[in-house]
UniProtKB/Swiss-Prot annotation:
The keyword Phosphoprotein does not apply. Disulfide bonds: none annotated. This is Probable transcriptional regulatory protein UUR10_0292. PANTHER family: TRANSCRIPTIONAL REGULATORY PROTEIN YEBC-RELATED (PTHR12532:SF6), TRANSLATIONAL ACTIVATOR OF CYTOCHROME C OXIDASE 1 (PTHR12532). One of its GO terms (cellular component) is cytosol. SUPFAM superfamilies: YebC-like. NCBIfam families: PRK12378.1, YebC/PmpR family DNA-binding transcriptional regulator.
Length: 236
């Protein structure tokens, strides 16, 4: 009996997590469609938002409803960016989509306080990041040099590899074209998104890392927060 209860509890928690992801995907689609129009081919942000939603199993019907309802439903949504610092000078950017700015800033301040960090002035932290299109593909189909030759006409910022993955960074304007070239050449794309990439990385001791993990988890569990990014050297 207790075991069944634990299984049911685990299933319910997983369903709640999935519902939260879908809600965030829907909010991003609405905001992207309102800001850049309903055509994903002419709106790179919307195209990325749709792909992320599909990767998280949000139905196409739900995606269409959110695009079509963007002009009405997104009126109350406001996009906010909070910049700040954590332990050891850790640079942090938090992006939110919210219909209640006071609620969101109050929550974000609380998260920074528990991290023993502080919110900084606008643009004081963003200078430590560059916005690039990042594409991660596995190495099974072609070598790094072969991919580089295929992408030579794109504005590639960097291309590197580890034992399993090739990472390609491009300017945002070339993101869609680069992704299409990869798809047309049978690349196994593990991840594709336009994101902020730190210009440099820092390390943390174990105690500070634990606080950072709690901070990131709190942000990810907040319905108003779309994403959080830092210049910590490890992936959490």
């Amino acid at each position: 009996m207790p075991r069944k209860h634990l299984i049911a509890s685990g299933i319910n928690k997983k369903q709640q997590q999935q519902a939260k992801i879908w809600m965030k995907c829907a909010k991003e689609i609405k905001a992207a469609a309102k800001m850049g129009g309903p055509n994903p081919e002419a709106n790179p942000r919307l195209k990325v938002a749709i792909e992320r939603a599909l990767n998280n199993n949000l139905s196409r019907d739900s995606i269409e409803r959110n695009i079509n309802g963007a002009s009405k439903d997104a009126d109350n949504l406001k996009e906010l960016t909070y910049e700040g610092y954590g332990p050891n000078g850790l640079a942090i950017i938090v992006r939110a989509l919210t219909d209640n700015e006071q609620r969101t800033i109050s929550a974000v301040r609380g998260y920074f306080s528990k991290l023993q960090g502080q919110i900084a002035k606008p643009n004081s932290v963003s200078m430590l990041f560059n916005e690039y299109g990042q594409l991660l593909i596995d190495k099974k189909t072609k070598t790094l040099d072969e991919w580089f030759e295929l992408l030579v006409d794109q504005d590639i910022v960097d291309i590197n590899e580890d034992d399993e993955i090739i990472e390609i960074l491009v300017q945002p304007k070339d993101f869609s074209a680069t992704k299409l070239i990869l798809e047309n050449n049978n690349a196994n794309i593990q991840s594709a998104e336009i994101k902020l990439i730190p210009t440099d990385f820092i390390s943390l001791d174990d105690h500070a890392r634990e606080r950072l993990v709690r901070f990131v988890n709190a942000c990810e569990n907040d319905d108003d927060i779309s994403w959080v990014i830092t210049n910590y050297e490890e992936e959490l």
